[in-house]
Amino acid sequence: MSGLKEKLVARALEEGFIACRICRPDAVPDVAARLKAFVDAGYHGQMTWMADRMHWRGDPTQLWPQARSVIMLAESYGPEHDPMAVLQQPERGAISVYAQGRDYHDVVKKRLKRLARWLMAEAADADPQVKVFVDTAPVPEKALGQAAGLGWQGKHTNLLSREWGNWAFLGAVFTTLDIAPDAAEVDHCGSCRACLDVCPTDAFPAPYKLDARRCISYLTIEHKGPVPTDLRPLLGNRIYGCDDCLAVCPWNKFATAARDMRLSARPELTAPRLADLAALDDAAFRALFSGSAVKRIGRNRFVRNVLYAIGNSGEASLRQIASELTDDPDDAVADAARWAVAQLGG
C-alpha cells in the first residue's frame, strides 16, 4: 500500500473536499470528560440523545472497535454574500448559511461514499472495511478534526482553520486500514473574543464552552415547544439557525465559497419575506424546503420561529398576519402568534 495516503488525499481533493487528514480513533481521550461536563451542566437542553449516546460520542473506539484509522474531511460552504446583512432587514428572515443550499447530509455523504468505494478498490489486497459518517451518528467530528490536523475547536466550539476559516462541513470515514496519522492542530485563537462578544444571547458561559439552551441555533432548530419568553426578543429575525459567531471570525479571510453548486445559497432563501413564510401550510412548507435541511424541523416549528421574528420586526403591517395564526392547531405556533401580536401593539 505504498503511497496510499498520498493518493487518498489527492483523490479527496479531486472529489471536492478542501482538506483531508488522518487520526486514530483513540486520539481524543479528553472528549468523554468534556461531554460529561456539558451534559452534567444541563447545557444540552432537550437534546437527550447526547446523554443517551454519551458512551459512543465520548469514545470513538466504542462506535466501531475494528476501526484503525479515521479519515477526516472538510467541505466548504462559504457564503458569497454577507450573512449578517439580512439582520438589518427586519421584515425578512435570516436562515443559516449552511441551510440555504441543498441538505449537506445528502451532498457530503454521497461524496464520502464515493471516496470510500475508491479506497476499498485501491487497497483491495488488504480487504478493508469502511463506514462513513456525516453528523447523524454519535461521532465527535470536531474533536477528531482537531486530532487529525484539519483545524482546531475555537472559542465558539466550532472547528476552524488557518487555511479555510470556519465555513466547512465535516465528514468522517472510519476504516480498518492502518494509515499513518497526521499531527494534531493547535489553538490559534489567541486573545480574540469576536465570536464570544457578538453572541446575541450570551450563550458562551466561558471561552470554549457553549450553553446550547441559550444558543439561537438550538432554540430555532432543536428546541420543541415555545421558546422562553425572555429569549424571544434576542432571536431578532433569525428563523433557522444563527451564523453570528461564525461570521465574525477573522480567520474567514481565508474562506472560500462552496465548490459544489448544490451547497450554494438558493436566492429565495437568502432573505425571504416573513409575510410569505408565515402563510406556509404543511404542503407549501415541504415544497419550498424540498432538499433543504430546514425541512427537518417541520412547518410548525418553522412558523413558530417566523412569528417570533414578526414580533421582533417592529412592522405594524405584519400584525394582521400574526393575528390570523393565533388559533393555529399547533400550540407553539398559536402562542408565538399571540406574542407577536402583543409585541406589535395588538
Swiss-Prot record:
Positions bound to [4Fe-4S] cluster 2: C199, C215, C242, C245
Which Pfam families does the record associate with it? Fer4_16, QueG_DUF1730
> Which stretches are annotated as coiled coil?
none
Q: Which cofactor does it need?
A: cob(II)alamin; [4Fe-4S] cluster
Q: What does the record give as its pathway?
A: tRNA modification; tRNA-queuosine biosynthesis
InterPro entries linked: 4Fe4S_Fe-S-bd, 4Fe4S_Fe_S_CS, QueG, QueG_DUF1730
Q: Which domain of life is it from?
A: Bacteria
What is the top EC class of this enzyme, as a single word?
Answer: oxidoreductase
Which compartment or compartments is the protein found in? Cytoplasm
Q: Where is the active site?
A: D135
| Catalyses which reaction(s) | epoxyqueuosine(34) in tRNA + AH2 = queuosine(34) in tRNA + A + H2O
Enumerate the residues binding [4Fe-4S] cluster 1. Answer: C189, C192, C195, C249
Arranged from A to Z, the UniProt key words for this protein are: 4Fe-4S, Cytoplasm, Iron, Iron-sulfur, Metal-binding, Oxidoreductase, Queuosine biosynthesis, tRNA processing
Quote the subunit structure annotation: Monomer.
This one is known as: Epoxyqueuosine reductase
Q: Which organism is it from?
A: Roseobacter litoralis (strain ATCC 49566 / DSM 6996 / JCM 21268 / NBRC 15278 / OCh 149)
Q: Which gene encodes it?
A: queG
